[in-house]
UniProtKB/Swiss-Prot annotation:
It catalyses: xylitol + NAD(+) = D-xylose + NADH + H(+); xylitol + NADP(+) = D-xylose + NADPH + H(+). This is Probable NAD(P)H-dependent D-xylose reductase xyl1. Gene3D superfamilies: NADP-dependent oxidoreductase domain (3.20.20.100). Keywords: Carbohydrate metabolism, NAD, NADP, Oxidoreductase, Xylose metabolism. It is an enzyme of class 1 (oxidoreductase). Transmembrane segments: none annotated. The active site is at residue 57. NAD(+) binds at residues 173-174, 222-231, 278-288. It comes from the Eukaryota. It comes from Arthroderma otae (strain ATCC MYA-4605 / CBS 113480) (Microsporum canis).
Length: 327
């Protein structure tokens, strides 16, 4: 059932590519294939226009069905939506970038991505999609194997996606400041966005300031902190106070008459950072989308930022992948 509070809209931020991107979207990570089509459809009815997907999430076909249903019913047009997907590491070789993008477009049932992102700054050994898809980090029980493709070659192929109108904007995810500095030295088309883990336990202030100063819009994933990682038996998440239950967050929620989740999302969006939460609860869908209609005080912003512990939950070695991407 769709939300009882439909037709909300999120403000947009301007990308350096010239396109506008909603500052609040719907993230598809860990959305079950069985419910994905309905969740996307209901999110569109609620007012969501940005959907953040990826090859690695394994639910792009289902997400596309939700989009197609909403378009068929006249709720939205394709041009009203901002659809994001990501290039997985097994497809970093320039000869595989365009086929990967076209495959994902076909799964969504669309002709172009509004934003196509390099998911991780590391190439993995190529896996034929006919053999395993999504390829994930490795086959079950095996170690991940790195590829032999430097990022500048991958980025050149990403730029060609823009040339061929398969992607309107291109971006990066999980990149360090050093990698961004290097990329900006050779990029013909600059990345429009940087997507990173960002919440009060991991503020990454230096990285965010550098990216924003260079004209990249920052998108935060895992805005609620440990919440999404508990079911993955992530030790860092299970041993930490949930941000939704933290006294600092709850105090602001009570003051503003909002939910703790809305406070966490507003802490990001008020600082110009896009967010991509998800929910299958109609009321929470609307609440998350409505997380820009109030302002936190400067003191509240500082108090929330002061919760920083440098605590990263999405760290490949923590789930058995032998690549210390973040050191």
């Amino acid at each position: 059932m769709a939300s009882t509070t439909p037709n909300l809209t999120a403000p947009a931020v301007k990308l350096n590519s010239g396109y506008a991107m909603p500052i609040v979207g719907f993230g598809l990570w860990k959305v079950n294939k069985e419910t994905c089509a309905d969740q996307v459809y209901n999110a569109i009815r609620t007012g969501y226009r940005l959907f953040d997907g990826a090859c690695d999430y394994g639910n792009e076909v289902e997400a596309g069905k939700g989009v197609a249903r909403a378009i068929k019913e006249g709720i939205v047009r394709r041009e009203d939506l901002f659809i994001v997907s990501k290039l997985w590491g097994t497809f970093h070789d320039p000869e595989h970038v365009e086929p990967a993008c076209r495959r994902q477009l076909s799964h969504w049932g669309i002709d172009y991505f509004d934003l196509f992102i390099v998911h991780f700054p590391i190439s993995l050994k190529y896996v034929d999609p006919e053999v395993r898809y999504p390829p994930e980090w490795s086959a079950p029980g095996e170690k991940a194997e790195s590829g032999n493709v430097p990022l500048y070659k991958t980025w050149g192929a990403m730029e060609e996606l823009v040339d061929k109108r398969l992607a309107r904007s291109i971006g990066i995810s999980n990149f360090s400041p050093q990698l961004i500095m290097d990329l900006l030295r050779y990029a013909r088309i600059r990345p429009s966005t940087l997507q990173i883990e960002h919440h009060p336990y991991l503020t990454q202030e230096g990285l965010i300031k550098y990216a924003q100063d260079e004209g990249l819009v920052v998108t935060a994933y895992s805005s609620l902190g440990p919440q999404s990682f508990i079911e993955l038996e992530n030790k860092a998440a299970t041993g930490t106070t949930l941000l939704l239950e933290h006294p600092t967050i709850k105090s602001s929620a009570e003051k503003h008459g909002k939910t703790p989740a809305q406070i966490l999302l507003r802490w990001a969006t008020q600082r110009g950072i896009a967010v991509i939460p998800k929910s299958n609860n109609p009321d929470r869908l609307a609440q998350n989308l409505d997380a820009t209609g109030f302002n936190l005080t400067a003191n509240e912003l500082r108090a929330i930022s002061a919760l920083d512990q440098g605590l990263r939950f999405n760290n490949p070695p923590s789930y058995g992948v032998n690549f210390p991407i973040f050191g």
